[in-house]
Regions:
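Alpha-helical substrate-recognition element adjacent to the catalytic core
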Residues: 2-121, 126
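C-terminal cap/substrate-recognition subdomain and adjoining C-terminal extension
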Residues: 77-91, 98-230
Length: 230
């Protein structure tokens, strides 16, 4: 019986070649955002508290935001990966602890308007200030987007392939059926014994996805257990 997969894909540092929120803060952030970052890195505050405080320190209007976002590059193989996932019947969602509007604008530039985006919301007040809302937060999770809750809610009958690179993916990686991992997430998977394959980018992910759906090939070249459902 062929395993049915869904794909949850991180954005910052995974699809994009840089962290979009950090890029916005470096260009438009008022003093104080780095101190919040230091508090988060040190574990004194959670990711949601950090991001909410940092977004409130963004300066500049929508045009200024667009100028920064329109310089952000994505992995050149990502569009081909999206096409392959669609052809294979694998629903793909962007699940990010970043900001929805920047992600949507960047993806739209590459013709990817159709991808579902589950992320924190970037809002602008009547007074022209930026703020963040977290509709996908959970009371027992410090992240703005609880990726574990998202995974549980999205087509639970399908096995989950997670693609990511960093700390916001650590918790959900332990619950996913398989992880395509890079950078910090790769180190975490290795240290925690989580089923994974290492990638440098989406060229690698394309090759691995082909292997994943070809059982005869996978048995010889993809030495990972096929998820078993009761």
């Amino acid at each position: 019986l062929r395993v049915q997969w869904k794909i949850l894909c991180d954005f910052d540092g995974t699809v994009s070649l840089q962290d979009v929120t950090d890029t916005l803060l470096e260009r438009l952030g008022q003093p104080g955002w780095r101190a919040l970052e230091d508090d988060w890195v040190a574990g004194r505050i959670g990711a949601r508290e950090c991001m909410s405080g940092q977004v409130a320190l963004l300066d500049g209007d929508v045009d200024a935001l667009h100028r920064v976002l329109d310089e952000v590059r994505i992995d050149p193989a990502f569009v081909r990966f999206v096409d392959l996932a669609r052809d294979l019947g694998m629903p793909l969602s962007i699940v990010s602890d970043g900001l929805d509007y920047p992600i949507a604008r960047i993806l739209a530039r590459h013709g990817l308007h159709q991808l579902p985006i589950i992320a924190n919301r970037l809002l602008r007040t009547d007074a022209g200030q930026w703020r963040m809302a977290s509709p996908h937060a959970q009371p027992d999770c410090a992240s703005g987007t609880c990726k574990c809750a998202v995974m549980a809610q999205q087509e639970p009958a399908r096995s989950t392939l997670l693609i990511g690179d960093g700390r916001s993916d650590f918790c959900v990686a332990g619950k996913a059926d398989l992880v395509f991992a890079k950078d910090g997430l790769l180190r975490h998977c290795r240290a925690s014994g989580i089923a994974h394959r290492a990638i440098d980018g989406f060229d690698d992910a394309i090759s691995l996805l082909h292997e994943l759906v070809a059982p005869a090939v996978a048995s010889a070249r993809f030495p990972l257990p096929v998820p078993q459902r009761a």
